[in-house]
Amino acid sequence: MPGITREEVAHLARLARLELKGEELDHFAGQLDDIIGAVARVSEVADQDVPPTSHPLPLTNVMRADEVRPSLTPAQALSGAPAQEQQRFKVPQILGED
Amino acid sequence: MTVTDLVSYEDALASYDPVMGLEVHVELGTKTKMFCGCSTELKQDANSQTCPVCLGLPGALPVVNEIGVESAIKIGLALNCEIAEWCRFARKNYFYPDMPKNFQTSQYDEPIAFNGYLDVQLEDGEIFRVQIERAHMEEDTGKSTHVGGATGRIHGASHSLLDYNRAGIPLIEIVTKPIEGAGARAPEVAKAYVAELRELIKALGVSEARMEMGQMRCDVNLSLRPHGREEFGTRSETKNVNSLRSVERAARYEVQRHAAVLSSGGTIVQETRHFHEEDGSTTAGRIKDNAEDYRYFPEPDLVPVAPARDWVEELRKGLPELPRLRRARLKEDWGVNEHDMQSILNAGAVDLIVATTEAGAPSDQARKWWMGELARNANETGRGLDELPITPAQVARVAALVAAGDLNDKLARQVIEGVLAGEGDPDTVVEKRGLKVVSDEGALSTAVDEAIAGNAAIADKIRAGKVAAAGALVGAVMKATRGQADAARVRELILEKLGAEG
């Protein structure tokens, strides 16, 4: 049975930029392991004739003509930004000092 | 930063065999972004071309741009790839401020095009086949401006500013299979491949592929292995190498650097490296994340793309002549040597010359003007030939006026100068500047008589049979007519009047 270890949860938390305390890692590792186990049961009933699916609707080729539509104004685009400068989104330092 | 020791290129090649992988990103020339209708026009106001989809706002639904898909298929076909019957987009998850969604919509294990090749011609004419692994669809990131550090670099910056106008512009990433067997010519192969790919993309009309504008960017992956070993060494990935010359230099530098590290008993770290135009060196960037850290998964907001076979075949039929074959054909037609053809190519003059001949000019005349006067002007004014305010049809008209004897070369140059200065089309410039060759025999005859009278000593020499002296009188007439006389006709008149045989 596939499962997930506490180390893997800690790794994923780091990738997702989530700060988890030790007891939270224990807690979520157990819960996630249960969930993965439950989902894995699907593959027990899915036989060769059932292809993996990523979309519930049997649709393909939904495309859009290459025609320009109005964009937001810069003010609208920036309205949710915690900080802005020179009509741009302002973000904290990307690289730490090294 | 420490100075990296290098071994000489020859020594590196004596011990090691280079293996390369090239990843090229091409920004498509679509009017709108890959998954939304925002304009892709360059140099617009910051954040004036964004919407909920490309900003990744909750609830926004992307829809794929059909020209984006069509362009990807055309590129795939031109690279002799198979086109997927069915493929999906995938989310590549990572946190970086240039991607407002916190994931890039890309393709993972189901690229739209795969398993192809591109034949490239090296400088000595040898054809080298570069195998293509895949070409897939994805989207560009936003543009960062780093504030507070030295010369805009990310190192030492206090904060960064983001403009998302570019975020979501369609990109096609083209990945080669490992390029083996190029040996010492690996850097040359890398350059020739990127050059050929650029020509191909332009010929397909899917992008202008201007490297200096970031419309085409290359990553050079390189590793060395000792001669005789099958297994690849650890590779470095030099990012954003953005000119043909830099591609060659980056590959060469990495060969020398790897060899220095390996032969001193060190190990190559798998990392991204930054290329520096100033001295052709590379420096370490971040240690590469493992692929699984991107946690790719199928994009649930987009449905699969399943290109109908008849559509694919229709696109295949519409493919243009391959640039390499077209070049060979034109070289033959024009009767030029490899070196001249290369100069024409480097100057970006091929299409202009073709258009000029199509407008009626003989190819030697079209070449002469584009590679001479016009190339000089473009060079002096820091423009591309295609940016000059003169059309191939106008150049053809100038050539026609010369052929008809209405202009001589000197006057033709003045006409071109006038057209470039915005004075109008060639006929208008001729009219306004009064540049017609003086073909009025009466006026010419008078000018010749005056020249003879004013240079009696020279005239005597010519009468005595010293025909070569006629040049001085021709010069005098040309001066008197401000260059507007037909020099050959002037010479004839002089000899005739002085009773000398030409």
Swiss-Prot record, chain A:
Q: Which reaction does it catalyse?
A: L-glutamyl-tRNA(Gln) + L-glutamine + ATP + H2O = L-glutaminyl-tRNA(Gln) + L-glutamate + ADP + phosphate + H(+); L-aspartyl-tRNA(Asn) + L-glutamine + ATP + H2O = L-asparaginyl-tRNA(Asn) + L-glutamate + ADP + phosphate + 2 H(+)
Keyword Membrane in record: no
Q: Which domain of life is it from?
A: Bacteria
Annotated segments matching region Disordered: 75-98
Write the Enzyme Commission number(s) for this entry: 6.3.5.-
Keyword annotations of the record: ATP-binding, Ligase, Nucleotide-binding, Protein biosynthesis
Does the UniProt entry include the keyword Ligase?
Answer: yes
GO BP field = glutaminyl-tRNAGln biosynthesis via transamidation; regulation of translational fidelity; translation
Pfam families per UniProt: GatC
The record, for Gene3D superfamilies, names: Glu-tRNAGln amidotransferase C subunit, N-terminal domain
InterPro entries, A to Z = Asp/Glu-ADT_sf_sub_c (IPR036113), GatC (IPR003837)
A single MF term (Gene Ontology) = ATP binding
The text of the family note is: Belongs to the GatC family.
Q: PANTHER family, from UniProt?
A: GLUTAMYL-TRNA(GLN) AMIDOTRANSFERASE SUBUNIT C, MITOCHONDRIAL
Q: What does the annotation say about its assembly with partners?
A: Heterotrimer of A, B and C subunits.
What this chain does, per the entry, is described as: Allows the formation of correctly charged Asn-tRNA(Asn) or Gln-tRNA(Gln) through the transamidation of misacylated Asp-tRNA(Asn) or Glu-tRNA(Gln) in organisms which lack either or both of asparaginyl-tRNA or glutaminyl-tRNA synthetases. The reaction takes place in the presence of glutamine and ATP through an activated phospho-Asp-tRNA(Asn) or phospho-Glu-tRNA(Gln).
Q: What is this protein called?
A: Aspartyl/glutamyl-tRNA(Asn/Gln) amidotransferase subunit C
The species this protein was found in: Streptomyces griseus subsp. griseus (strain JCM 4626 / CBS 651.72 / NBRC 13350 / KCC S-0626 / ISP 5235)
The gene name reads gatC
